[in-house]
């Protein structure tokens, strides 16, 4: 931090990012130089063959060129190790060294081309020497190609637009010119992000919904990154420091007092009943993912189990299946739920932006009509997730501020139209009129199921929804309170998705800036220690962060320090209305319903692969998920199969200890 300025533009590469790639190149070049020197010294007396003078000259010049490159790369690595993330002063000579290093590519390319031309002439010399020359030519071009790929990756399309402007634009321009300039920069940033999103999702169709999703996603990213000059390695270092800081705080904090029951809060028996319901309905949410999740959960036997059904010819039994040409999804759903053919009302695997797959089945054990919505599993689903603007819902209920996540609300409306207008629910209740409507889903599907329950509650007052790992940024405060009567959310451990919202991402950005500003260690040490700590553990106290007196004074006010550092060290980036010091354009949204948190108690290894973990179920408040936690299980805990195993474990433990007093967790209103 900040990104380097080379050739008059900013690049997505900091001057302290070259320790690891430089060390790797240094190792490769030294090894290359030793091999070339050995080859020359061993075979120099055999180079009296036709064309041997050319090969001898090639090796001598190559050795000299490699020596110069090695010295330059060594200097780059040494300079890159100096200073800290927010103190690039000791690395001010880095740009000159990089200019020298890039200039050395020209003679290297010329010499590699000459070597290839000379070898192509069919020089009649010792075969070992010729093979060695061919190897050096190949390695030269591999290094050059790798460098070109790296340049493409660190190229910042906005670097040329932002770098020439002074750091405080409003002081140099009148208000109208300043506003026009900032508007132009924001438009350019959004255009660049939209191009990136379209490139990443090039296989997604180009209908109206997709174009709207592209624009919404680009707007989200351009707004989020508009006021920072962070490069990707800065974010990785910030995650590492936050992980250790978070563990340090949790180790020093006293264990929370367990409250089994207070007046007006849910009884422990209700918690047991809801955990059992979650255990029952989670397989339906998992089944909505179809055969990919089934194969993932059963890697050795899954294909054999559903293979026969995949190859079976479609007959009348499959009339309710939509978008499953080879019946593999249907076969996996049958295996996952254990239901019969006659229990399925409708299965849709139609998948577009704002249009999610879902299944409708009859659950005779719980006497319910279950609608299971699939979570994120395609690029279309990702675009739905990232359409994070808020949208007002017309629900016909006496509530103010009925606002929800736009993408998920659109998906819920689509399923609502299908269920109601296409008569799918009417068909289900004509078969089982006394059954209760239950909506379930995981991840994105959990958010859609919760919103769908809100939309259907007027027609089905007894509707229930079970949202497994729902996104946090879903409902406004009023809808969150309203949904508590009929929605239960289940969150496992450190799962990042139930903590993920635009406001929480803003908070994470502030915390990253603060912890980077506080740290006086070079980036390479932060990343090395972070990898060791993440893999093997250790004490976070062994990696202190300190501040000098001047910076400490600047950081006495919240966010002032990192904001000062940004304006001080980011000449190319400027924002007069930075999201860091102004209200976010995205309102605060909340997860749906009452929340059950499955907390890990037993040790299962840092990645959950060493032994079976022990979990404790308890009622939790949404405020407990108002910060994103950094840890090795923040993604693992979101996987459906991990949640199924955790529920199996919780239910088994509760069944075994049903007579033990004091079991269970705290209750939160």
Swiss-Prot record:
Activity regulation statement: Inhibited by the 1,2,3-triazole urea covalent inhibitors KT109 and KT172. Inhibited by p-hydroxy-mercuri-benzoate and HgCl(2), but not by PMSF. Also inhibited by RHC80267, a drug that blocks 2-AG formation.
Active site: 443 (charge relay system), 495 (charge relay system)
Transmembrane segments: 18-38, 59-79, 103-123, 129-149
Cofactor(s) this protein requires: Ca(2+)
All ranges on the Cytoplasmic side of the membrane: 1-17, 80-102, 150-669
GO molecular function: lipase activity; metal ion binding; monoacylglycerol lipase activity; triacylglycerol lipase activity
Classification via InterPro entries: AB_hydrolase_fold, DAG_Lipase-Related, Fungal_lipase-type
The name this protein goes by in its record: Diacylglycerol lipase-beta
Source organism (scientific name): Mus musculus (Mouse)
